[in-house]
Amino acid sequence: MQATKSPDDLVKTFKSILKEERFGSQSEIVTALQAEGFSNINQSKVSRMLSKFGAVRTRNAKQEMVYCLPAELGVPTAGSPLKNLVLDVDHNQAMIVVRTSPGAAQLIARLLDSIGKPEGILGTIAGDDTIFICPSSIHNIEDTLETVKSLFNYAD
């Protein structure tokens, strides 16, 4: 006979499932938890767990609305150090792209615009979590990239 799973197992599995960022409804989460062996789970309990852990719905990489946890989301707060809001910095021959926590791109872009041309930044365009940086000169894009990375203590 199989031992029943503990509440700690449920919490661990619940968090693991939300990290997958592919569940857009509570019923999908119920089904996934039942598949993991939690037969006594229902929509009401999932709803309470979502509230308890502060889960929110946001868009994943495929632009689907899914549930995720705040720790995975990295929601900016007034006390968030700016370096914690920058998730990735990359570039090609013409542009630098900065990925941020959801909702942080406008704040980071405003900072980048304020340092501007002296640091090699002609301008920025920001969405919710992505910033396109147009360098003053594509010939010095590596220098501008390093400036942006050092500004946020970002290391590859």
Swiss-Prot record:
GO CC annotations, alphabetized: cytoplasm
UniProt keyword terms in alphabetical order: Amino-acid biosynthesis, Arginine biosynthesis, Cytoplasm, DNA-binding, Repressor, Transcription, Transcription regulation
Pathway linked to the protein: Amino-acid biosynthesis; L-arginine biosynthesis [regulation]
Major place of residence: cytoplasm
BP-aspect Gene Ontology terms: L-arginine biosynthetic process; protein complex oligomerization; regulation of arginine biosynthetic process
The keyword Hydrolase is assigned to this record: no
Keyword Flavoprotein: no
TM segment ranges: none
MF terms in GO: arginine binding; DNA binding; DNA-binding transcription factor activity
Pfam families, per database record: Arg_repressor (PF01316), Arg_repressor_C (PF02863)
Compartments reported by the entry: Cytoplasm
Domain of life: Bacteria
Family (UniProt): Belongs to the ArgR family.
Family matches, as PANTHER family: ARGININE REPRESSOR (PTHR34471:SF1)
Role this protein plays: Regulates arginine biosynthesis genes.
HAMAP family: Arg_repressor
Name of the protein this chain belongs to: Arginine repressor
Organism in which the protein naturally occurs: Shewanella halifaxensis (strain HAW-EB4)
Gene (UniProt): argR
